[in-house]
Amino acid sequence: MTWRERAELRIGISGMPGVGKTTLVLKIAELARSRVKVCGFVTVEVREGGTRIGFDVVDLANGRRMALARVGRGEPSVGKYVVNLEACNVISEALRRECDLKIIDEIGAMEFKCKNFGEDLQTALHTSPRVIATVHRNYIDIAKKLGLEIIWLTRENWGLVFRQLLIQLGLTQ
C-alpha cells in the first residue's frame, strides 16, 4: 500500500517526561521527509549548564525557531516558566500550513496559553490527512475528544511504537 492509499491517521503520543515523545516524532518526520511534505512544530528543551531553562518552538517546514518559554516571573506562566506569546505566531503558522504529515509537539498547557491554539488545533486535525501529536498527560481527555487515538509511550515500548507508526504511515520498505 502506498503513502497516498493510507487512510487518514490521528495519533496522540503521551507518556511521562523523558520517555522520548519528541524524539519519536522527530525521527518519524525525518524519515517521512524523503517521501512526503512534512509540517508542524516541535517544542525542544533549552538547557544551560545542564539545567533546563526553558523551551523553544521550531517550525518543521522552515526551521524557524523562537523562545516559547523561559524560567522567570511574569504572565502568562506555566509552573516556573513564563510563556512568550510572540512564539504563538510560529505555532499558529505551523498548524495552518498544508502538508501530508503534520507533527504537533505538543498539546499541553504552554501551547494553550496561545489565544488561537485550540481553534488552530481543531482546524489542523480536521484538515490534515495524517497527524501525529504529542500530548501532555494532563491533556489526554481533550486529545481524545478531538479525535486522537492515544498511545502511551514508555522507554520499554518506544521501539515497538516507532515501528508500528512507520508501518501505519507506510514508511517501511
Curated annotation (Swiss-Prot):
Listed EC numbers: 3.6.1.15
Instruction: Name the positions where ATP binds.
Output: 15-22, 101-108
Coiled coil location: none
Q: Name one GO molecular function term.
A: ATP hydrolysis activity
Task: Return the SMART domains for the record.
Answer: AAA (SM00382)
Its job: Has nucleotide phosphatase activity towards ATP, GTP, CTP, TTP and UTP. May hydrolyze nucleoside diphosphates with lower efficiency.
Would you identify the family this protein belongs to, as annotated? Belongs to the THEP1 NTPase family.
Q: What is this protein called?
A: Nucleoside-triphosphatase THEP1
